[in-house]
Amino acid sequence: MRLYRDRAVVLRQHKLGEADRIVTLLTRDHGLVRAVAKGVRRTRSKFGARLEPFAHIDVQLHPGRNLDIVTQVQAIDAFAADIVSDYGRYTTACAMLETAERLAGEERAPMPDLHRLTVAALRAIADGRRARELVLDSYLLRAMAIAGWAPALTECARCAAPGPHRAFHVAAGGSVCVHCRPSGSSTPPQAVLELMSALHDGDWEYAESSTPPHRSQASGLIAAHLQWHLERQLRTLPLVERGYRVDRTVAEQRAALVRQDMAHGNHTGQEDLPATASGA
């Protein structure tokens, strides 16, 4: 089979044998691809840091029966240096990469919009111009929209009656009207749903004027909606440092374990791990 080239974001990697690694890539034209990078763990490897998580690369691959083989790599954007130097940026970007892998679906199913969104979001985290918790929540909402799982925010999730509606129910699909509202629905302030809409639509002026309590509530609803559809917890999302105080000692210890998993491959591949997109 012929070699092929593609642009990709490195989602994660893990060890294979004494000198190789298996890398998981979100490519622009071929979707999720897993490939072997031979000799990459040697100190003189020609690939080196180009295949570290968070890297945006131009990669050439040789198709294989089970795993492709990386033959050439060129760096496009080196986001890792700015991301890994800061705990908050690092945990936020980890949550993005895990989400991207979960939403990408089957291997080799093209997801060009998800690829573009992920690159834009990593760029926004690396440059630090916007609040990282807002960038993350915007990314999660838009990524869910690409996958067809976006919560209903301006109409009833069940009957499509135009809103705004006060109630929100994750299993129902988002905001719900008084006639369709299931028991157990939450009733967040209207400003919370408006913030979620702003994050989805890229209205950064509104999003950045929001209050910490509203951001916290919106984050909770977004995370709950995502994980309900994924039918599993994201292992990186609880590590994300947001605007409220965290226990840095415990959180950084937990983040170190995730860093080891992603960078050094202490788990197998079967385990856990646009106009508006440009400003994600």
From Swiss-Prot:
Region (Disordered): 261-280
Gene Ontology biological-process annotations: DNA recombination; double-strand break repair
TM stretches of this protein: none
Protein keywords: DNA damage, DNA recombination, DNA repair
SUPFAM superfamilies linked: ArfGap/RecO-like zinc finger (SSF57863), Nucleic acid-binding proteins (SSF50249)
InterPro entries: ARFGAP/RecO, DNA_rep/recomb_RecO_N, NA-bd_OB-fold, RecO, RecO_C
One GO location term (cellular component): bacterial nucleoid
Protein function: Involved in DNA repair and RecF pathway recombination.
NCBIfam families named among the record's database cross-references: reco
Family: Belongs to the RecO family.
UniProt name for this protein: DNA repair protein RecO
Organism in which the protein naturally occurs: Mycolicibacterium smegmatis (strain ATCC 700084 / mc(2)155) (Mycobacterium smegmatis)
